Amino acid sequence: MKVFLLNRSATLLLAAVVLMSCSENEQRLVEKGFERAAQQYELMYEATPLGMYPRTVNNSGETRLIGAEPLKSGANWTNGFYPGILWMLYAHTGDVQWKAKAEKVTRALEVQKNQIYHHDIGFIIMASFGKAYEYCPSEYYKNVIVHAAGSQLSRFSEITGTTKSWDQWTSRGGIYTTYYPVIIDNLMNLDLLFKAYELTGDEKFLKPALSHADKTMANHIREDGSAYHLVAYNPETGEVDARKTSQGFSDSSAWSRGQAWAIYGFTMCYRFTKKPEYLETAMKAADFFINHKNLPEDSIPYWDFNIGEFTDYEWAYDPERFEEEPRDASAAAATASALLELKSYVDDPAKAQQYRDAAVKMLSSLASPAYMAERGENNYYLLMHSVASVPHNSSIDKPETYADYYFLEALLKLKNDL
């Protein structure tokens, strides 16, 4: 009995040491990420005129800046991430200088509350005004959120039960056109509607959000948990007309960032509603991602999970174009952030730990020299090696503000879980 007790005590002590070591490593990971982010975004803030919002780097090597005004093209869907990054730097450091910077660039984006040209008002407002309200609640921020949610409702159809992403979409080869496209990314914009309902209690915001989430669950998610990128609806009957892709490899493939949006989006829907089917769908999508045979060893995915595996594509795919297919750091960052929330809703401790471990592995890879830029490099963005769209030849192997945003958001979640 004494020997057993000694062995048990030694085992418990060893476990405590291991846990402490893991916790210390994760604390260093958080501090490293935010220290470098502060260095980069101090320089970014100094270099960026007020009212302009960094998105990526042009092929010429110059920082691509987008104005605050709503655009029909949807090119400014990323505008909220820059102020959101500044808000998270304030949240982590408590430094009021970051708060002042965040307030300035957030207020300059208020014009977006009237954006009705595309679905991404949710991304724009919740990454900026949503973070502002989270860290510094005020009637001003609340009113902008609620007003913007009203603008988003203008794109909802009772017939399809969904919010229309764009007014028109044509496939890369010009073979197919739809006037009611809904992409998996759109799920993320429900955050705005759910928040407006939470702030007002007005069900005009809740019902469209629930309807869109339910339709996405039914029509975008495959049996294996992967997500179709684009579902085309018949605007007169509400029926599904086609399932396609815009940014993925093929109609049948799983676009990596689209998969991240599915995991994150259904996790967010569960947060607001506690509907078990949303949790089940989020887990199904997460399991597809983290267990996929084509996920690289460092857990940073290629831009699509099925490159070269299907033939239903309409773009000029050249298997010899890249020595190695581009990775998408933004997909890993968004997935890591989603997993660190998802794990808190899972009853099975082993499953929750699996999600946490997967997230930490992604974050550790992103914080390595292979993905995190040195101070003053990378046009002052934090992470390297993201992809906007290979089929569109758009921003391939470039930095993106949304990669930095979700990386820092994930680090804050990890910090709160230490």
Question: What kind of region is each of these model predictions?
Answer:
Residues 20-21:
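C-terminal motif of bacterial Sec signal peptides marking the signal peptidase cleavage site
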Residues 25-418:
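Glycan-recognition and catalytic cores of secretory/periplasmic carbohydrate-active enzymes
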